């Protein structure tokens, strides 16, 4: 059994479905004693893991389901060597919400100096990358950056009373103020190995 918990959210992994069903049942009964219940939409049992894809393929079923946890959609995949990997992409709903907030702020700052807006955007984007720049998520973050460039371009073109700036004129501005994404975190196994190296994993 593997459990990852943060605040009141948790993910539990089991080798056998019966064990997962037993824990869910016990958990529901425990909460009911206090007049509580699990979230009906967020609580579910799914087949996930190293053998999920092959087992489902044998049964004529589709790809393993995904789940969202701590702002990431987790899904089964493989790396360049064909080894099983749990990939994480920024949850689409979460990214749309962030982009909407930034877009609104860009409109509000329409007539502020470019350097002021750019410095603000850079801080926002770097902070976003600090959390979301995990292995396998760069394509999503690249789309995030591309969307921001479009939003800012729209604002800059609207405030110009003369010639509307084109992409060639705006690209250097975007390159200066909106950093391109790069992976900032190792895969979880690397961090875990660094913490337990030289010690028993059973401690």
Task: Tell what function each PLM region has.
Residues 1-203:
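Non-catalytic terminal/accessory segments
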